[in-house]
């Protein structure tokens, strides 16, 4: 199984600079990126303002999940190249990929993916110049 946590990058800046309708657009684009990248009946859900989770049950491995992440990032890349928006829509992603046992709760696995997502978001912030 895998759990993917995604958090839209720079939503506050988009809302504050370009208005909430553009922020809503960025959220919708993120939802579309996740939904259109699903290939095996994964569950995609918005869990908060700019936070999403994707859960895939079954036989997933790191290569399959990495392909899924590449598809999401490819969706964002194509959107950003064609949208003519003054901002980029991107998301930070964290993943748990492995097995679940009777001692592990779904919340614990989501927390693992969430922590990785925030680690990735902080790395992006440190490398960004905006």
Annotate each predicted stretch with a short phrase.
Residues 1-2, 9-39, 45-49, 53-54, ...:
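Conserved long alpha-helical elements within nucleotide-processing catalytic cores of c-di-GMP signaling
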Residues 5, 56, 93-97:
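Sensory input modules used in signal transduction
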Residues 20-21, 36, 58, 78, ...:
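A short linear boundary/processing microfeature
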Residues 66-73, 77, 81-84, 97-129:
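Catalytic-core segments of nucleotide cyclases and related cyclic-nucleotide turnover enzymes
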């Amino acid at each position: 199984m895998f759990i993917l946590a995604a958090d839209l990058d720079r939503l506050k800046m988009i809302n504050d600079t370009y208005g909430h309708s553009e922020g809503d657009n960025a959220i919708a684009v993120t939802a579309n990126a996740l939904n259109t990248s699903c290939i095996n009946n994964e569950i995609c859900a918005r869990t908060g303002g700019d936070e999403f989770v994707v859960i895939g049950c079954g036989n997933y491995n790191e290569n399959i999940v990495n392909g899924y992440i590449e598809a999401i990032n490819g969706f964002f890349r194509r959107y950003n190249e064609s949208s003519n928006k003054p901002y980029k829509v991107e998301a930070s992603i964290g993943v748990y990929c492995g097995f679940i046992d009777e001692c592990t709760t779904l919340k614990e696995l989501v927390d693992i993916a969430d922590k990785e997502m925030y680690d990735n978001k902080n790395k992006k912030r440190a490398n960004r110049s905006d």
